[in-house]
């Protein structure tokens, strides 16, 4: 007989779904009255102190809250997870009765004169007005144990998925949020989807997602179950997914990150199954991770998860971590100190499994899918540089551009260089005097900020493109005549260059209805 696994934490404190749902309307009333909103908190704290809050530095925030009245009380209560005077909390939360909040599992009373929160209740603005999200406390400002059923709040992964999700629609759409957690994606989806369904394996996540929707007065269908089981037989216009994709051993210590599947099995399940739940023309935006293995191209690995027919895929790798960095990052994320025996035991198993599988790195990024009625086509790319603009609607544009290339003769079309495209000629001093060009590049100044190295012929071709000018074939003919060569020597390179720049939005076909 074996004892309990020392690496598996206990569950989180209990919550009462019905009681929390009853609290949602009066809690929203209190928040609106006090100004407990993203904009209200920024105005009260100021930029510098607000930045300190984001860094998990509570002292400057506490100092500012002293002069911020009821709003300061709620910031300390919910964002700093401080012990707060019970009378001050009662005033700030009115018309919520703190006793009701205690029975629901929102608050606890460590002593008769103070209360503290058991949940993180956080305002945020996703670009379409204020929302609130209810999750478990993450320990960034108050030391807490991260429970096995911990429901993650608003983090880097969830916000990156928000920015990466297409919101452009041609009419009412249905949307599935797979692995909703606390409901961040579902809340965001309500701004552009007519009907939103959210699923999660975790019973606690289902409750908190329902509470998040109720607190925002939004109608979201939230159902419990693993993977796509709760929506078996159903199809949607859009799917977003932030599943427990962490590459691991198959052990489950935290349900928000561990799928119970070996290595990148969770991402494989989601990527391979999502097309079955898309309407024709529907799209999916999936957060995913994949292993890099000696002797195997990561692009081929992810592409192998897709069916041979019926899918367009754009796979975007945003980062790659070495095994030690990957394991250390997720140990700390789970609240473990890597120096402790429990963390050491887990890290030993984790690193041994990665070594056994010849894993050299772990890739992370987005998989965009579109359901079609033709053979599957896959474009997999590295995009590891920083981005200023959201990636979301770019995916729809990429699919449109690939469609255009399938149905047009590239050489016979007219083009224009996108206005945000910059040309760079880098030259170094020539030993014999003057300057010698060492590299030529074109940069896209918006969106994914792609850049391509080109040669002198490529630069000349791009200089000759005009929407009201000559077809590409004629531009190449003129260039060939000027160079004294046969146009057949230049045409393949010109077609390949223009095709690549069309896909990345640096060049657009004449008459294109969209700028990219």
Model-inferred region functions:
Residues 16, 33-119, 137, 146, ...:
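Hydrophobic alpha-helical segments that drive targeting, anchoring, or assembly
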């Amino acid at each position: 007989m074996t004892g309990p696994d020392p690496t598996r934490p206990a569950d989180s404190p209990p919550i009462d779904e019905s009681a929390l749902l009853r609290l949602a309307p009066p809690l929203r009333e209190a928040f609106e009255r006090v100004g407990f909103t993203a904009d209200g908190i920024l105005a009260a704290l100021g930029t510098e102190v607000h930045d300190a809050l984001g860094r998990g530095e509570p002292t400057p925030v506490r100092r500012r809250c002293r002069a911020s009245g009821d709003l300061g009380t709620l910031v300390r209560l919910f964002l700093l997870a401080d012990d707060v005077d019970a009378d001050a909390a009662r005033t700030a939360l009115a018309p919520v009765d703190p006793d009701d909040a205690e029975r629901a599992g929102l608050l606890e009373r460590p002593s008769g004169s103070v209360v503290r929160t058991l949940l993180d209740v956080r305002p945020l603005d996703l670009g379409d007005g204020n929302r609130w999200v209810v999750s478990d406390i993450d320990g960034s400002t108050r030391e807490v144990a991260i429970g096995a059923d911990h429901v993650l709040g608003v983090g880097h992964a969830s916000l990156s998925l928000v920015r990466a999700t297409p919101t452009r629609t041609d009419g009412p759409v249905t949307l599935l949020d797979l692995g909703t957690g606390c409901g961040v994606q579902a809340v965001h989806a309500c701004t552009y989807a007519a009907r939103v369904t959210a699923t999660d394996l975790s019973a606690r996540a289902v409750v908190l997602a329902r509470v998040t929707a109720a607190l925002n007065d939004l109608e979201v269908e939230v159902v419990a179950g693993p993977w796509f089981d709760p929506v078996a037989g159903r199809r949607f216009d859009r799917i977003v997914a932030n599943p427990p994709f962490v590459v691991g051993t198959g052990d489950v210590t935290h349900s928000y990150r561990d799928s119970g599947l070996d290595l990148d099995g969770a991402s494989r399940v989601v990527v391979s199954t999502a097309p079955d739940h898309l309407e024709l023309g529907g799209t999916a935006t999936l957060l995913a991770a994949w292993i890099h293995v000696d002797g195997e191209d990561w692009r081929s690995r992810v592409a192998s998860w897709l069916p041979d027919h019926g899918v367009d895929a754009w796979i975007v790798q945003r980062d790659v971590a070495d095994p030690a960095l990957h394991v250390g990052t997720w140990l700390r994320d789970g609240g473990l100190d890597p120096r402790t025996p429990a963390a050491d035991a887990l890290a030993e198993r984790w690193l041994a499994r990665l070594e056994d599988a010849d894993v050299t790195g772990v890739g992370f990024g987005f998989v965009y899918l579109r359901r079609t009625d033709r053979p599957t086509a896959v474009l997999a790319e590295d995009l590891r540089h920083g981005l200023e603009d959201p990636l979301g609607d770019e995916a729809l544009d990429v699919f449109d551009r690939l469609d255009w290339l399938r149905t047009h003769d590239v050489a016979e079309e007219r083009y224009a260089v996108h206005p945000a495209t910059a040309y760079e000629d880098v030259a170094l001093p020539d030993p014999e005097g003057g300057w010698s060009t060492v590299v030529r590049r074109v940069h896209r100044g918006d969106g994914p900020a792609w850049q391509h190295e080109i040669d002198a012929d490529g630069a000349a071709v791009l200089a000759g493109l005009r929407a009201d000018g000559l077809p590409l074939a004629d531009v190449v003919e003129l260039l060939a005549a000027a160079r004294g060569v046969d146009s057949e020597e230049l045409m393949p390179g010109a077609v390949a260059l223009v095709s690549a720049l069309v896909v990345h939005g640096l060049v657009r076909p004449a008459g294109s209805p969209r700028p990219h």
